[in-house]
């Protein structure tokens, strides 16, 4: 099966923790431009920014990116992607990769990897990536999403909680990682087949998705298989807060 794919970058202006986040300047360029440039370095046939704000559309046009204006009332980035897939008239079996608009350091290799993984695993309707958790602070951080997979590499669940809970080890100490437990951090990049996006939107959010604020749980709730692989090149964490923004600025302005 072909692994040709389209990248869509959802970019909301009204971020709760960092308003106007896609347009925040990093080394003289808006953050969304950094993300777009990284996506353009991948093997994607097309890279599209999907936004709910005309200011972001105009900024994208200024540096040559294709941008589509979408509705403001989407429940998640995946819901926004579904609108874009419909606007673009993508075939049901076309692969779409969701690259978060706050990942200015995302390696192009992981974009290619997640698209290729979905193409290779026809039993899955979504694919995503993970990396090992190597310190206990990360493990207990609710801003870090944990993922557990089965022996075939399909997701069993995702959670902000410490998952799985090593009962005996944590009864002794929570100061170090339990031995023999392969804890993994979910990396928020997804590949889908365009036809699946229509189904995803039609289902609407479930209580589990709303409780954890994790859109992928809607797919699991409906029995969708999600393929999870360890990233060949783990990306740095994205920009969620003003502190994250300053960290990325220091890296890219050095």
Curated annotation (Swiss-Prot):
It comes from the Bacteria. Coiled coil: none annotated. GO terms for cellular component: cytosol. Signal peptide: none annotated. It is found in: Cytoplasm. InterPro entries: Cytidylyl_trans (IPR003329), KdsB (IPR004528), Nucleotide-diphossugar_trans (IPR029044). HAMAP family: KdsB (MF_00057). This is 3-deoxy-manno-octulosonate cytidylyltransferase. It comes from Pseudomonas fluorescens (strain ATCC BAA-477 / NRRL B-23932 / Pf-5). The gene is kdsB.
């Amino acid at each position: 099966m072909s692994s040709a794919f389209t990248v869509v970058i959802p970019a909301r202006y009204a971020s709760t923790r960092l308003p106007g986040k896609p347009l925040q300047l990093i080394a003289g360029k808006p953050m969304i431009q950094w993300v777009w440039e990284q996506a353009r370095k991948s093997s994607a046939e097309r890279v599209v920014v999907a936004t709910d704000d005309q200011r972001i559309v105009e900024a994208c046009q200024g540096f040559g990116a294709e941008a589509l204006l979408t509705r403001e009332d989407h429940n998640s980035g995946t819901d926004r992607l579904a609108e874009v897939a419909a606007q673009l008239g993508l075939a049901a079996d076309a692969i779409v990769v969701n690259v978060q608009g706050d990942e200015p350091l995302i390696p192009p290799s992981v974009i290619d990897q997640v698209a290729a993984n979905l193409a290779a695993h026809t039993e899955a309707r979504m694919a995503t990536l993970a990396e090992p958790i190597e310190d206990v602070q990360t493990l207990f951080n609710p801003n870090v999403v944990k993922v557990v997979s089965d022996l075939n590499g399909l997701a069993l669940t995702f959670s902000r909680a410490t998952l799985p809970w090593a009962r005996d080890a944590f009864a002794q100490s929570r100061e170090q990682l339990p031995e023999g437990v392969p804890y993994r951090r979910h990396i928020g990049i997804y590949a889908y087949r365009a036809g699946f996006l229509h189904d995803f939107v039609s289902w609407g959010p479930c209580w589990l998705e709303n409780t954890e604020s994790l859109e992928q749980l809607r797919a699991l709730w409906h029995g969708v298989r999600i393929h999870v692989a360890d990233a060949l090149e783990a990306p740095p964490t994205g920009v969620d807060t003003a502190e994250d923004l300053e960290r990325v600025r220091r890296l890219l302005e050095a």
